[in-house]
Amino acid sequence: MSTLRVDTVMTTELVTVGPDDTLGEVREVFDTHRFHHLLVVEHFKVVGVISDRDLLKHLSPFVGKLSERAQDAFTLQRKVHQVMSRNVVTIRADTDIAQATRLMLDHGVSCLPVLDERQHPIGVVTWRDLLKAVAHCGLDPLCRLPNSAA
């Protein structure tokens, strides 16, 4: 029986950051793109994930405000490796979405980097992607999503 696979729902437009990039740079990426997660990549390998929530948690709430002080602005200079999630759970593109969902729930994560056979990132699947698939297809294994890769 055919099942809906990760490659039919994953985002393939990857924007990555490096572990030595600053939180200021990450903030610019989040402001420019409509992502909630960024893969942290070093030498073509995923070494971490940083979410918009991680960013907000580690930036001063006074950045960009009239009451901003030097120590508030300094939070923009912190490095990605200081705040990223390091225990990354990854998945392959040919994995079915039920297994992807179980992995997210079992590990308490909201995204899974999708890796190729060389362990290089080729996409990312988020809980939103999985929820959209279920909302559109229900449990129909033959369903194809609009704009799907497969």
Describe the role of every protein-language-model region.
Residues 30-33, 38-54, 104, 112-128:
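A glycine-centered beta-loop-beta connector
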Residues 17-34, 40-42, 81, 90-108, ...:
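The conserved cystathionine-beta-synthase
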Residues 1-13, 51-89, 96, 101-105, ...:
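Tandem CBS (Bateman) regulatory domains
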Residues 13-16, 45-46, 90, 120:
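Short, flexible active-site loop motifs that bind/organize anionic cofactors or intermediates
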Residues 37, 44-45, 66-69, 76-78, ...:
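Short, surface-exposed, polar/charged, turn-prone segments marking secondary-structure boundaries
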